[in-house]
From Swiss-Prot:
Compartment(s): Nucleus, Nucleolus
Chain positions covered by the region annotation Disordered: 1-32, 75-94, 113-132
Regions of compositional bias (Basic residues) in chain numbering: 113-125
Protein name: rRNA-processing protein CGR1
Origin superkingdom: Eukaryota
Main location: nucleus
Keywords: Coiled coil, Nucleus, Ribosome biogenesis, rRNA processing
Alphabetical list of InterPro entries matching this protein: Cgr1-like
GO cellular component term, pick one: nucleolus
A Gene Ontology BP annotation from the UniProt entry: rRNA processing
Pfam families from the UniProt entry: Cgr1
Compositionally biased intervals (Basic and acidic residues): 8-17
Coiled coil stretches, renumbered: 57-115
Length: 132
């Protein structure tokens, strides 16, 4: 199937019909020297640039799309899970701070304020040493 086979005679460019028609400047002369011959298109459809995917290429394309879809879905799930874990850890940290504050307030009722401050500093020091 040539590109000009579907056209009407008047629509076909002259270079395909008339051998004496002037050539394009960039086209140059033929290698075999037969410049009087008519220019023709490729006979096979594959060489015209129209490409039909084979079943293997089609499967590979689908597999690639499916893989990209799965990775994107997994990334979204991971982001959601990370956000959830972050909220939980923030909540735990706030609860720990609140519990520690209440404990020091209870101690302050029983003891002198300076002694509570000393105990707080000592506990912070021990906590820092333990975390190392």
């Amino acid at each position: 199937m040539s590109a000009s086979s579907q056209m009407e005679y008047k629509d076909i460019p002259k270079r395909y019909i008339d051998p004496s028609a002037p050539k394009d400047v960039g086209e140059g002369s033929r290698v075999n020297g037969k410049d009087w011959k008519i220019k023709k298109d490729a006979f096979r459809v594959k060489t015209l640039g129209v490409k039909k995917l084979s079943t293997w290429e089609h499967r590979e394309q689908k597999k690639l799309e499916q893989q990209q879809y799965k990775t994107r879905l997994q990334d979204l799930k991971q982001e959601k899970e990370d956000a959830k874990n972050q909220r939980i850890s923030d909540l735990k940290r706030r609860r720990e701070i609140k519990a520690e504050k209440e404990r020091y307030e209870k101690m302050a009722l029983k003891m002198h304020a300076k002694k509570v401050d000393r105990m707080r500093k000592r506990e912070k020091r021990n906590k820092m040493l333990k975390e190392r």
